[in-house]
Amino acid sequence: MLDVNSVRKHVLKTGSLTSAVGTGTIYQGTYNRYAKKKELNIIVTSSGSNNVIMRQVPLFDKEDLDAMKSDTTSNKYLHIGCITVSIEPLLHQRYMKNFGKTIAGNCAIIDSTFRKVDQSIISLHKYDLSRGRADYVSYPNHCLSLTDPMIQKRLSVLLGIKGIDVEPGVELFSICIGYIVSSVNTLHPVSQLGIQGVAINGTESADIDELGAEDIDQLSLSYNDSKIISLPSDEDIYYRSKGSLFSKGRTIKRRTMRTRVPDPEEPIKLTKSQSSRIEHGKVMRLLKNKQIREKIERGMIA
C-alpha cells in the first residue's frame, strides 16, 4: 500500500512524485525487477487568456516505444501500473496565498483513440493549488498490446487549468507526468482489482458525472482543440527513486519540454527534448574543430 504521508514528505524534499512511489507497491518478483519508471516535465506558457488548456500529451515518446518493441520477443503486453501527475506554479507566494484556491481545474488520463471524451477517460481528478502544488497518483491497472501501432495514443493526459490572467508568453506552471509500467505475458500481473486513485496534495478523485457543465465543456473542447505545442529543451533531469533497506532505488530520467502558443497556421506537434549529454558532445566537437582550425591558421599543423 502507498504511504501517503511518506510520499508527501518525499515530494516536498525532491520534487518528484514518481520517485516517491515504489515499484514494489505495484509489482512483485520479476515484474518488479523489470518495471520501468519515467517522467515528462512540461513548462506551460500562458496564452494571454485566463485559461491554459493542454490536451492529449502522450506519455510515451519514440525512445520509450523503441524500448517497448524490443520486449515483444519475450512479452506480449505492457501493463500500466501507475501514472503520477504533479502541478507546480511558477508564481510568487503572496499570489498563491491569496488566490491559490481559485487556480483549479480537472485532469484526466485518457485513451485518445476513442472518439468521445467521456468514453476515453481512464482516470479523472479535480485539483486546486491552495496548498502550493497538486499531486495525484492513479493506478490504471490494465494492459496494452506491445504490437499495437496506436500504442502512443492509448495513454495520454488531458489537463485544464483556469484562473490565471497574465500577459501571453509567461511561464506559469511546471507539470510533471510520470509512469510505472512493466512488460508482461499475462493480462493479470498484479493482485490489485479494478482501478484506484490516491490523492496526495490538493487533489480529489472525481467522476465525469460529478462535473459541472462548464467543466465538461472545457474537457470536451480541449479533447478536440490543442492550445499549446511543445518545444525541445536541454534540461533533462535524473532522480533517484526511493529505495528500501536492501536497494538504492532506480534512477529516473525526467524529460523536459517547454511550450508556447502556436501560430494558427502552424501544425501542432509534440517534440521530445534532447539529452543534455548529446548537446555536450556537440559542443565538445565544435570546440575541438575550432582549436584545430586555429592551429592551422597559426601554422602549427602542416
Curated annotation (Swiss-Prot):
* Transport listed as a keyword: yes
Protein name, as recorded: Probable movement protein 4b
Source organism (scientific name): Lettuce necrotic yellows virus (isolate 318)
Q: Which domain of life is it from?
A: Viruses
Query: What is the purpose of this protein?
Result: Transports viral genome to neighboring plant cells directly through plasmosdesmata, without any budding. The movement protein allows efficient cell to cell propagation, by bypassing the host cell wall barrier.
Keyword annotations of the record: Host-virus interaction, Transport, Viral movement protein
* Record's keyword annotation contains Transport: yes
For this chain's UniProt record, which GO biological process terms are given? transport of virus in host, cell to cell
